[in-house]
């Protein structure tokens, strides 16, 4: 990562990463229940 000299707080990065992970998992399960993720 680039050195942001503390401009971006770690809690913000963690929050964004957490939302992204939850979103991807949600889409995966939604696709599975909809039959779109049947290939996995």
Swiss-Prot record:
<dbReference type="Pfam" id="PF01788">
    <property type="entry name" value="PsbJ"/>
</dbReference>
<comment type="subunit">
    <text>PSII is composed of 1 copy each of membrane proteins PsbA, PsbB, PsbC, PsbD, PsbE, PsbF, PsbH, PsbI, PsbJ, PsbK, PsbL, PsbM, PsbT, PsbX, PsbY, PsbZ, Psb30/Ycf12, at least 3 peripheral proteins of the oxygen-evolving complex and a large number of cofactors. It forms dimeric complexes.</text>
</comment>
<feature type="transmembrane region" description="Helical">
    <location>
        <begin position="8"/>
        <end position="28"/>
    </location>
</feature>
<keyword id="KW-0150">Chloroplast</keyword>
<keyword id="KW-0602">Photosynthesis</keyword>
<dbReference type="GO" id="GO:0015979">
    <property type="term" value="P:photosynthesis"/>
</dbReference>
<keyword id="KW-0812">Transmembrane</keyword>
<keyword id="KW-0604">Photosystem II</keyword>
<dbReference type="InterPro" id="IPR037267">
    <property type="entry name" value="PSII_PsbJ_sf"/>
</dbReference>
<comment type="function">
    <text>One of the components of the core complex of photosystem II (PSII). PSII is a light-driven water:plastoquinone oxidoreductase that uses light energy to abstract electrons from H(2)O, generating O(2) and a proton gradient subsequently used for ATP formation. It consists of a core antenna complex that captures photons, and an electron transfer chain that converts photonic excitation into a charge separation.</text>
</comment>
<dbReference type="GO" id="GO:0009535">
    <property type="term" value="C:chloroplast thylakoid membrane"/>
</dbReference>
<comment type="similarity">
    <text>Belongs to the PsbJ family.</text>
</comment>
<dbReference type="InterPro" id="IPR002682">
    <property type="entry name" value="PSII_PsbJ"/>
</dbReference>
<keyword id="KW-0934">Plastid</keyword>
<keyword id="KW-0793">Thylakoid</keyword>
<keyword id="KW-0472">Membrane</keyword>
<keyword id="KW-0674">Reaction center</keyword>
<protein>
    <recommendedName>
        <fullName>Photosystem II reaction center protein J</fullName>
    </recommendedName>
</protein>
<keyword id="KW-1133">Transmembrane helix</keyword>
<dbReference type="GO" id="GO:0009539">
    <property type="term" value="C:photosystem II reaction center"/>
</dbReference>
């Amino acid at each position: 990562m680039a050195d942001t000299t503390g401009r971006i707080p770690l809690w913000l990065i963690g929050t964004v990463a957490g939302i992204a992970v939850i979103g991807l998992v949600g889409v995966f399960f939604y696709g599975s229940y909809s039959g779109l993720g049947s290939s996995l």
